[in-house]
Every structure is written in C-alpha cells, then in structure tokens.
C-alpha cells in the first residue's frame, strides 16, 4: 500500500510517500520559521495561509522524486489534530479533495501518534511494549505503549510543555525564535555549576511535569544578573546551560520512574525536543545503566514531518480504518482515546 502523508498541524508543511513494502519513498518539508521569527512565535493565520501556498508544490515534488503518479497512490493520510485549527483544516481539505478526485480512502492521523511512531522508520525500530516520552512544543507526556492505539497515559505536564518552556525562556533572556535550538547552542559554551536551577516536581511521587516555575526561576536569575550589570553573552550561556540541565535531568528522573513502575526496559523519545543532544546523551547513559535501550528518530523526523503521518496512517489503513468524506479536525484530541490496531 502506498500512502501519501500530509502534515499541517502548526508551522511546517510536510508531505511524504510511504510504501508498506518498500518503506519511505520520498518526503519534502517546508519550515515557516523565517516567516514567524519576526513575531517571536507562530501566528496562526499566517501559518494557515502559508500551508495553502506550499502544499501542492510539495506534493508535486514528492511524486516527482518517487517516480509515482496519482494513479499509484492507494490512500491519503493527514494530520487531523491536535494543532492549530486553521492549519489542520488546510491539510484535511486538501487530503479529502484528493481522495475524492483519485477515488482512494483518506484517514486522519493523530499528530502525537505520528511522533510516537516516527522511530519505526529507522533501521532498528523499537518493539512493543515500551515507554514513550513525548516532548514537543505542545506536549510533554509519558505513555505506556503496548501496540498501535494501545496507549496508557502515565504522566504529563500540568502547565507548560518542555518545548514551550524552552521557547519562552529563550525569549525572556533575549534570544531568538525558535528558542530550543538557541538555548542548546548557548548551553554548549556555558560554565557548569555557575547556576543551579531546581528540578520541578521531582521531590514528590508521580510522573507529572511542571516547567512554568522553572521558567520564572530563570527569568528572576537573569534579572538579578542584569541589575548587577552582568548581562554578558557568557552569562546568557551559563543560564542557558543551567536551564537545559534542569529540564533534561527532570525528564531523566521521570523516565527512570516510569520504566521502574512499568517494569519495561525500552524507551522511545519523540517530538521536537527529542532532537536535543543533551537529552539523548543523558537517556542513552541512563538506559545503559538500566540494561535497557533508547530509541529515537533521525533529527529531521523529530520535528513535524509528513513521513511520520504517512507511516502512522498506513498502519491504520492496513487495519481497515479510514474516514468518511466529511472534513473534520480536532484541535484538542487525547491520544489514549484512539482505537487499537
């Protein structure tokens, strides 16, 4: 089965073609970072308009690169949520229109399920069951995964997601957008131990997260430095390192708890923050000590992309699941409500 995947949940337009027997045939992505950078964050209306502009050229590019024509497409998968409603509607409308014109089924895919399954595109994919850490701009969750659609939420952020905290903190200390890569870049030049930030909610039982207080702690630290006349680039680097270390160690502590609680040895990390090298290194060391294994997608499949949507959609289509012709999206959509495959 050849499935065309469309991703338009936020500020990246992704298109990919996945073959159930041959794997990923082609993928293309357009990032709107430059469009939104001047505003310091994503502007939903601009995101939707740019998806409209980019979608068809990217589809043509993927078809050309794969050597396929519309007649070779067996189904279409699209991100149906969660995400920005206008952006989601662009992808859903395009998918349903092409499905009708080409006479093929369409299926809406949960954006975070796409992220969770992205490591399945690698040469050594994880095997069920495993614990998944989903870390992105909109989500920070620990999930027990027993199969596709068989998800048990173990813990989640009660306020800011980890990726959101990175972006907001970067803005507070005068860094550019997107904040995650900026903080990671500065942290490489930071002085270890100059600042020590708290590890939120690690002093109590449970698997939930909270990063809002850490963001405020970082701002207060920066403001004290500025008032003391120490707003140098090195101070920014030192604060960036302290913040990143606090977030990473908080995630590590919670992941260790989740693995011990479930008795599982394999961990999947997915979502945009999973590309952070400090997080990857920390988890690899921890899982090595626990005689387990950590899995993640290649960096370009950590952020939003069409390949993960094509793959996730293909699994549900092979199980006989597909949508009717109505155009419907779900800006808020709990992943544990998905049917099992």
UniProtKB/Swiss-Prot annotation:
GO biological process: tRNA threonylcarbamoyladenosine modification
Keyword field: Acyltransferase, Cytoplasm, Iron, Metal-binding, Transferase, tRNA processing
InterPro entries in the cross-refs: ATPase_NBD, Gcp-like_dom, KAE1/TsaD, TsaD
Main localization of the protein described in the UniProt heading: cytoplasm
GO MF annotation list: iron ion binding; N(6)-L-threonylcarbamoyladenine synthase activity
Annotated residues for binding of Fe cation: 111, 115, 304
Highest taxon, organism lineage: Bacteria
Cofactor: Fe(2+)
One Gene Ontology cellular component: cytoplasm
Pfam families noted in UniProt: TsaD
Leader sequence residues: none
Cofactor descriptive note: Binds 1 Fe(2+) ion per subunit.
Reactions catalysed: L-threonylcarbamoyladenylate + adenosine(37) in tRNA = N(6)-L-threonylcarbamoyladenosine(37) in tRNA + AMP + H(+)
EC number: 2.3.1.234
Residues holding substrate: 134-138, 167, 180, 276
Cellular localisation: Cytoplasm
Function comment: Required for the formation of a threonylcarbamoyl group on adenosine at position 37 (t(6)A37) in tRNAs that read codons beginning with adenine. Is involved in the transfer of the threonylcarbamoyl moiety of threonylcarbamoyl-AMP (TC-AMP) to the N6 group of A37, together with TsaE and TsaB. TsaD likely plays a direct catalytic role in this reaction.
HAMAP family to which the protein is assigned, alphabetical: TsaD
Stated family: Belongs to the KAE1 / TsaD family.
Protein name: tRNA N6-adenosine threonylcarbamoyltransferase
Organism expressing this protein natively: Pseudomonas aeruginosa (strain ATCC 15692 / DSM 22644 / CIP 104116 / JCM 14847 / LMG 12228 / 1C / PRS 101 / PAO1)
Source species taxonomy: Bacteria, Pseudomonadati, Pseudomonadota, Gammaproteobacteria, Pseudomonadales
């Amino acid at each position: 089965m050849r499935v065309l995947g469309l991703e338009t949940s936020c500020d990246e337009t992704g298109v990919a073609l996945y073959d159930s027997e041959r794997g990923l045939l082609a993928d293309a992505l357009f990032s709107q970072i430059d469009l939104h950078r001047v505003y310091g964050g994503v502007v939903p209306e601009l995101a939707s308009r740019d998806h409209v502009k980019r979608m068809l050229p990217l589809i043509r590019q993927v078809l050309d690169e794969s050597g396929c024509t519309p007649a070779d497409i067996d189904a279409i998968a699209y991100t149906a949520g969660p995400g920005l409603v206008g952006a989601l509607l662009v992808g859903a409308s395009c998918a349903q229109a092409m499905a009708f014109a080409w006479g093929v089924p369409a299926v809406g895919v949960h954006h975070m399920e796409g992220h969770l399954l992205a490591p399945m595109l690698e040469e050594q994919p994880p095997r069920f069951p495993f614990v998944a850490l989903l870390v992105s701009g909109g989500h920070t969750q620990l999930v027990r995964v027993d199969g596709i659609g068989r998800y048990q939420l173990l813990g989640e952020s009660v306020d800011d997601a980890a990726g959101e905290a990175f972006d907001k903190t970067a803005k507070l200390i005068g860094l550019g957008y997107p904040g995650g890569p900026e903080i990671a870049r500065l942290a490489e030049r930071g002085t270890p131990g100059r600042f020590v930030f708290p590890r939120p909610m690690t002093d109590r039982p449970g698997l939930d997260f909270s990063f809002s207080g850490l963001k405020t702690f970082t701002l207060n630290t920066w403001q004290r430095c500025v008032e003391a006349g120490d707003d140098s680039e090195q101070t920014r680097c030192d604060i960036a390192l302290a913040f990143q270390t606090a977030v990473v160690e908080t995630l590590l502590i919670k992941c260790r708890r989740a693995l011990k609680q479930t008795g599982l040895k394999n961990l999947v990390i997915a979502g945009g923050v999973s590309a952070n090298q400090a997080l990857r290194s920390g988890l690899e060391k921890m899982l090595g000590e626990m005689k387990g294994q950590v899995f993640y997608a290649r960096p370009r499949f950590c952020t939003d992309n069409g390949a993960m949507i094509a793959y996730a959609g293909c699994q549900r289509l092979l199980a006989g699941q597909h949508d009717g012709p109505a155009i419907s999206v779900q800006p808020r959509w709990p992943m544990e409500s998905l049917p099992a495959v």
